[in-house]
Amino acid sequence: MGKGVGRDKYEPAAVSEHGDKKGKKAKKERDMDELKKEVSMDDHKLSLDELHRKYGTDLSRGLTPARAAEILARDGPNALTPPPTTPEWVKFCRQLFGGFSMLLWIGAILCFLAYGIRSATEEEPPNDDLYLGVVLSAVVIITGCFSYYQEAKSSKIMESFKNMVPQQALVIRNGEKMSINAEDVVVGDLVEVKGGDRIPADLRIISANGCKVDNSSLTGESEPQTRSPDFTNENPLETRNIAFFSTNCVEGTARGIVVYTGDRTVMGRIATLASGLEGGQTPIAEEIEHFIHLITGVAVFLGVSFFILSLILEYTWLEAVIFLIGIIVANVPEGLLATVTVCLTLTAKRMARKNCLVKNLEAVETLGSTSTICSDKTGTLTQNRMTVAHMWFDNQIHEADTTENQSGVSFDKTSATWFALSRIAGLCNRAVFQANQENLPILKRAVAGDASESALLKCIEVCCGSVMEMREKYSKIVEIPFNSTNKYQLSIHKNPNASEPKHLLVMKGAPERILDRCSSILLHGKEQPLDEELKDAFQNAYLELGGLGERVLGFCHLLLPDEQFPEGFQFDTDDVNFPVDNLCFVGLISMIDPPRAAVPDAVGKCRSAGIKVIMVTGDHPITAKAIAKGVGIISEGNETVEDIAARLNIPVNQVNPRDAKACVVHGSDLKDMTSEELDDILRYHTEIVFARTSPQQKLIIVEGCQRQGAIVAVTGDGVNDSPALKKADIGVAMGIVGSDVSKQAADMILLDDNFASIVTGVEEGRLIFDNLKKSIAYTLTSNIPEITPFLIFIIANIPLPLGTVTILCIDLGTDMVPAISLAYEQAESDIMKRQPRNPKTDKLVNERLISMAYGQIGMIQALGGFFTYFVILAENGFLPFHLLGIRETWDDRWVNDVEDSYGQQWTYEQRKIVEFTCHTAFFVSIVVVQWADLVICKTRRNSVFQQGMKNKILIFGLFEETALAAFLSYCPGMGAALRMYPLKPTWWFCAFPYSLLIFVYDEVRKLIIRRRPGGWVEKETYY
């Protein structure tokens, strides 16, 4: 950094602004790189004395108000800096002048220019150019407003962070407790928090009483985490003695010293990182840009060629400029901007019905071109509720039902041991169902209590009936709640069973701790001594369930003998007067947050669609790997390096990493990797799980995938996911459990939090890309029959065959509904069985599409139009050869005696009525040939007969364009308004043969493509 400072200091005053900007940019990049690094702090390692010395805080009395005021003046308020927001007017201007709109604006300006030139040089200039300019401007403004309305979402990332900032904080200053505004909390303050509070800043805990915090928005762990003064982990995000700004304290109380405030907190760093990241251009925006380059190239090439040609043909400079402008404007597809916007909007609406809410229209297509999905685990791939998965009793493992609708397997519930186990699980449990939920299915009911206990409660309620009744029957006398030192929970109950002693002691906790307190074990309802063999059996079961990524709890009980503990005995939990050893071990119950039902199928679909699914989670590697196997992210038979090492019984470092298709990467390993090593992992492993990752690492993984050229979708729900969501090509947030911040950073929100909805989105995205190609091919084709009349008018000097107003009637009238109807077309083949498109080679509009639309189908259409034009003029006495070179006298308003081929004389007014009738007929001919074009654009490879005519909107479009053409031709008063005149019915049929020719020509072309895949015809004409 010294270099930058030095330069600014010693350079002369005339330093260029460019240099300054460059410096700012470099500094921003350095800052961003700094934020991407892991959190480095050592406050969690300091002893209380060192903490006191570092912050100068009295650990019981806190800071003095004067010292706090000094620090506040030095550090500024404890608040997040809002990012620079884009003003709404700038966003509106982007919609008005971005991409496609620019092309139309240039067209409009050229029209006004041409009108200006004509007004200055002619006495009575025609108003066509003026109309065209006004219409083009109107089209841009209307579609711009429409797009702006669709995307009227501002960058509210920071506003949602603001909602996370607690308003009040309880601090101790000079020994007095006071509630102050959270913004006034300073580094070194002594702060007290209790259950229900938000943590006001990053705190180093110095004393705690049963304190648990919910870190899920930060680390993605769904279980509340215990907080205590003990230093338990090198990693500050994992140690118990740091509580983070804006996480929630769920139970207990704690005191801590503030170590970071505002932007310097861990959450503040994530916020700054998320708002500072630049999301790149969406793939569809790049495609539209590419398309504009193509069209502009064609327009300018034609314009300049004919400009030179008209000078060679001895037109004046002014006329040549008017022609140049006319040709460029005629090449602009006026209706296409509206068509693309409407097609994307329709798809967005369709996706919303399928639970995918798209915030940004262009993101609709991005999902279709996705090649890698980085998915969060908790709540996206899994159900986000702990569920009992297995039990071990009677020396065997039993499987519980983890399906969402309880349609899975059941186990033997007749064993006496199961009765004892379910009794302990129901009684030694503080979770309760919330009130008034009797009508809801058990699994859907809300529970007050921690995740593991509510899983047990629901399991017992499903298997054994009402737990409330069981608890009333066995009333509780005393209890010792779970704590982190003894790692068990114990309660003593009255036993109503006459055949057993009067008191029942039940205990649950960490399996190894519970086993240590037992001397016997219950097998098939009979108590037996716990020998080594049974201990081994326990150990194997414990390892097996733990290896499945499940959380295992052990359960034991003891029937307290009546002679020692008669009825009314006073149990004392402080000075324990009852046995807590030599108990009877009953069994294990293991829990997992199980996969959602639809996920394995969705992952399979992604795989067949060529999309790589990577799991990125903050959870433990074992759990992550188990879920990855459960949902098919690691498919059957694919091994990780560890699996291969275990199978061959060799150390892990002797296995060649390339032999393993699957790979589980721990966050701590990722921390020390270079970007080249990460690239290697992403390149050579097809199935990857990243576990125990931090927010910054999620971002690094996304950037790694993008370096490989992948188009990356990221799913996430926590604040921790927001930088990755913002950086990804498409960020997908969760609608139900997602934090506001993640929803703001994302481009799309899954309303049902289900990974399977993403697959629906991919399908819709691929379909709209295919259908947009069809819409564009359809729209561009009519450009040729619109341009050629003008070109022939210049070269052959004939009366103008088609006027500007009629061109507008096609582009903004008859072609609109049919072009949009193609968005409703069904897929030709299974789009989910092909690889993602390659953004470099598979373009929305390529040279082949242009050559088909302009060079082939468009030419046939133009022939149809000219045929009609010559037929009408011939019927009125002007034979084709007589027309050559007649233009100057024809357009001269003072000449009233132009002779036709039969010697009849025509006044100026009469000639113009015939000319405008020709314009109308040419327009109707284009509508007739566009019928065939619409039908052939339904498919790109299949025959139309295979595809069928199921698209009702398209059939409506055919009728609509015909009805509109008839209305414009026959409506009284159109002659004065749009200069369109009624046609003889026979003139409608002139273009029919050409329409049929287009249909036959294209069916033959597609037949050859299907018969000879990869052949010359496919290479040249398949778009």
Swiss-Prot record:
The protein's role, per its UniProt record: This is the catalytic component of the active enzyme, which catalyzes the hydrolysis of ATP coupled with the exchange of sodium and potassium ions across the plasma membrane. This action creates the electrochemical gradient of sodium and potassium ions, providing the energy for active transport of various nutrients. Could also be part of an osmosensory signaling pathway that senses body-fluid sodium levels and controls salt intake behavior as well as voluntary water intake to regulate sodium homeostasis.
Annotated source species: Mus musculus (Mouse)
Active site positions: 376 (4-aspartylphosphate intermediate)
Name of this chain's protein: Sodium/potassium-transporting ATPase subunit alpha-1
Superkingdom of origin: Eukaryota
Pfam families, sorted: Cation_ATPase (PF13246), Cation_ATPase_C (PF00689), Cation_ATPase_N (PF00690), E1-E2_ATPase (PF00122)
Stored SMART domains: Cation_ATPase_N
Positions of modified residues (N6-acetyllysine): 9, 21
